[in-house]
Amino acid sequence: MKATRKQLTQRRHFRIRRRVEGTGDRPRLAVFRSHKHIYAQVIDDEKQHTLVAASTLDKDLKGELASGGNISASTAVGNLIAKRALEKGITKVVFDRGGNLYHGRVKALADAAREAGLDF
């Protein structure tokens, strides 16, 4: 039986997670993309603790976005996650694309976070 897109994404994510780990000095910027929304978290894997989070469902973004599943929404989430991380003193992160291809919404979020001041 042929693997579904979801299964292929999960396989890629397992391979990525074997190599990518967030520390206290350089936490992991994890991205989850659903059909209608996009979510980003900055995670310290040593303490298993989420330091900062942002998504298209966030109160700060919910009113100004027409849709949560497009590139402009991803750019807004990238800017918001970078702003919140910088407020907590986090400047360097490791990018975890969550098994998604580095293209489209995931790339837009990463580019926006870089432009807003995160280093990865």
Swiss-Prot record:
<dbReference type="GO" id="GO:0022625">
    <property type="term" value="C:cytosolic large ribosomal subunit"/>
</dbReference>
<keyword id="KW-0699">rRNA-binding</keyword>
<keyword id="KW-0687">Ribonucleoprotein</keyword>
<comment type="function">
    <text>This is one of the proteins that bind and probably mediate the attachment of the 5S RNA into the large ribosomal subunit, where it forms part of the central protuberance.</text>
</comment>
<keyword id="KW-0689">Ribosomal protein</keyword>
<dbReference type="GO" id="GO:0006412">
    <property type="term" value="P:translation"/>
</dbReference>
<dbReference type="InterPro" id="IPR004389">
    <property type="entry name" value="Ribosomal_uL18_bac-type"/>
</dbReference>
<dbReference type="InterPro" id="IPR005484">
    <property type="entry name" value="Ribosomal_uL18_bac/euk"/>
</dbReference>
<keyword id="KW-0694">RNA-binding</keyword>
<dbReference type="GO" id="GO:0008097">
    <property type="term" value="F:5S rRNA binding"/>
</dbReference>
<comment type="subunit">
    <text>Part of the 50S ribosomal subunit; part of the 5S rRNA/L5/L18/L25 subcomplex. Contacts the 5S and 23S rRNAs.</text>
</comment>
<comment type="similarity">
    <text>Belongs to the universal ribosomal protein uL18 family.</text>
</comment>
<dbReference type="Pfam" id="PF00861">
    <property type="entry name" value="Ribosomal_L18p"/>
</dbReference>
<dbReference type="GO" id="GO:0003735">
    <property type="term" value="F:structural constituent of ribosome"/>
</dbReference>
<protein>
    <recommendedName>
        <fullName>Large ribosomal subunit protein uL18</fullName>
    </recommendedName>
</protein>
